[in-house]
Structures are given as structure tokens and as C-alpha cells.
């Protein structure tokens, strides 16, 4: 009887650990709101872009079923903050760290880092913004 109870407790502990491991793994699914953008130059320097109160509302939502929506904010010709919503689908290749969103247009980004509450992506393609012959990368930070 003691062996049976010990076996049951050990099995329960193993199952509990597996569940905890799955829950702690970061997921790309969720509502992501932009927090900042940093342009990292090929020469090692960087420039942080300050978002105005309108741009700081930009966000997108990725759902478990592969559907997505994004809301982009910008200033119109009259100085008003206006929004534009796009709906579509997405795919995420975890191994190659590629997120592709299919809405009004196709957007592909490289996932640099993902945690429970932060997503950092690199805009694709990269450009030589300062014309020094070195590739510069735009890092975009999002929070849940």
C-alpha cells in the first residue's frame, strides 16, 4: 500500500512539473503594445525613437487559432490622431524565429527575444540608413 501511495505521489509530481514547464514557456499569442523602437547602426551606435502619445497606442493581437488584428495610429493632415485596423492571419516559425503577418500587406519580422511580457522583433529587410556601407537594424519592442 505504501508503494502504491508513493508511486501515485511521484506520478502527480511529474505531471505537475510538466504542466508548470508548459505554462512558463513564453508564447507569441496575446495582445502586444509597442513600447519603443531602437535603430542599431552597423558601426555599433544606436538611436532610440521616442513615440508620441498617438504612436504609442499601436498594437496587435495574435490569437491561438492563427488569426490576428492590428491597430495602427498616426497623425493625419489636420493633426488628429487617427487609427487604422487590419485583420488577417499570422504564422510563427519558432525554430527560425520568423513571424509573418498577413493582413492588408504581408509583414515579416525576425523575433529577437520573447518573454512572458516582452517581445522584441527586428524589421526585415534591414537597410543602410546612414550610408556607411554597414547594415542597420530596427528593433521594435512590445509589451503585453
Give the role of each language-model region.
Residues 1-4, 18-19:
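Positively charged n-region of N-terminal signal peptides that target proteins for export
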Residues 5-9:
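Sec-dependent signal peptide hydrophobic core
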Residues 14-16:
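C-terminal motif of bacterial Sec signal peptides marking the signal peptidase cleavage site
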Residues 18-89, 93-144:
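Lipid interaction determinants
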Amino acid at each position: 500500500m505504501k508503494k502504491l501511495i508513493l508511486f501515485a505521489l511521484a506520478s502527480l509530481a511529474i505531471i505537475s512539473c510538466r504542466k508548470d514547464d508548459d505554462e512558463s514557456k513564453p508564447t507569441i499569442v496575446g495582445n502586444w503594445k509597442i513600447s519603443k523602437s531602437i535603430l542599431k547602426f552597423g558601426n555599433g551606435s544606436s538611436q532610440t525613437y521616442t513615440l508620441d502619445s498617438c504612436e504609442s497606442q499601436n498594437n496587435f493581437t495574435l490569437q491561438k487559432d492563427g488569426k490576428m488584428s492590428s491597430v495602427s495610429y498616426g497623425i493625419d493632415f489636420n493633426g488628429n490622431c487617427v487609427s487604422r485596423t487590419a485583420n488577417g492571419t499570422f504564422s510563427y516559425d519558432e525554430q527560425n524565429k520568423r513571424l509573418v503577418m498577413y493582413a492588408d500587406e504581408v509583414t515579416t519580422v525576425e523575433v529577437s527575444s520573447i518573454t512572458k511580457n516582452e517581445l522584441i522583433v527586428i524589421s526585415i529587410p534591414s537597410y543602410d540608413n546612414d550610408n556607411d556601407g554597414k547594415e542597420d537594424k530596427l528593433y521594435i519592442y512590445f509589451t503585453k
